[in-house]
Amino acid sequence: MNRRMKIARIGAARLSAALLLAALPGLPVFAGVQMAHAASTEPDQPADMLVPPTSASDFTAAQLDSVLAGSWRAEANRARDVYRHPKATLQFFGVRPDQTVVEITPGGGWYSEILAPLLHDNGHYIAAVAASSRDGEARRDDSALHRKFAADAAHYGNARIVEFDPKAPVFGAPASADRVLTFRNVHNWVMADTAPAMFKAFFAVLRPGGVLGVVDHRADDAASLDTVKQSGYLPTRYVVKLATEAGFTLDESSEINANPKDTKNYPKGVWTLPPTLTLGEQDRAKYIAIGESDRMTLRFVKPAAQAGETH
């Protein structure tokens, strides 16, 4: 095959891939058209350099890469990617740019910096925060989140913040969300005795077939809830119990956020480790070497509606 024919085939392949993407759910037509135009006008490249995305999952991965590299992300937050594995975690939860995603108690907005821009154009990001009667630290986090969103409309302008009552939570209209995500929060609800109500509210706001994604500090399998809950760690089986009693099915668990260096036995519980480092300079190097906590990563599904059921 001569060089001209090879280039023509490459261009045709790229054009086909771009038009395929244009037909994918959640990808606006103009994006596919722009990609098609680029495919027909870009200068010659070696064939092995051309790796056009050919599926919705490829497109989501490319979008995640772009967002994770975003200049709007705080440097301190970016430094924690090595512990929190945001790309792999969000892919495991099946997050796509065209979905409605509710993040429960986002704190200062570590994941907000990723999710809000990812969902800005074709989806909806909703940050659910507890009503403002809470303690000072929680109020400061929520105020910081409001300021973050207000200061950068280009990335957060379509994000919403909704308040809920932890004792009787409602996160939105029934069956209105594709994903509910929560990161390192369940232990707080267990200590406050609000966890069952929270999981029931997650179930209510999700569409049938929707996913609940949970990440939290993982206790040893043999640990009892009573002995560890004040440490910030939870037995995985207890979190599964909370979810299944609310109506969810455990779809899959992952070791994405595992840390085998975490012994889970510290003077100040999980808060002894980074990023909190409650002990300050005491044994700081030791705890930094351990890294952030060992975490369960659980994907639950709200069962699809059965024939004859209404929602």
Predicted regions mapped to residue ranges:
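Class I SAM-dependent methyltransferase Rossmann-like catalytic core
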Residues: L64-F92, R96
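A short glycine-rich, Lys/Arg-flanked "PGG" loop and its adjoining helix->strand segment in the class I
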Residues: A116, A195-P208
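Core SAM-dependent methyltransferase catalytic element
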Residues: T263-H311
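A short acidic, Gly/Pro-enriched loop at the edge of an enzyme's catalytic core
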Residues: V170-V180
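Conserved class I S-adenosyl-L-methionine
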Residues: D98-G107
